[in-house]
Amino acid sequence: MARRFTDQQLWQLRNEVSLPWLLQHLGWPHRRRDGQLIFVCPRCGESRSDLNPQENLVRCFHCQTNFNPIDFTMAARDCDFVEAVHYLLSLTDRHHIR
């Protein structure tokens, strides 16, 4: 399994993979309430969260953790960085994201 990725690949995964889309494809518990994206934090299990669409980050206000798509995938799938990037690359290839 390749361990090196281009800067462009990593930038695209962090910035172009929509976090609501990713939550849906991971089958991760989430919903919208009053315009706010509420999700179960993969670190602490709480649902005090929101999405910053300009930065493509989600934040858990309980454990004070920010997640980009790669970080969220690592936490949700309990995998390392390389596995998470490979998973996201395969997912985006199948859905023609890039």
Kindly label every feature range from the protein language model:
Residues 1-98:
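N-terminal structured subdomain of primase-like DNA metabolism proteins
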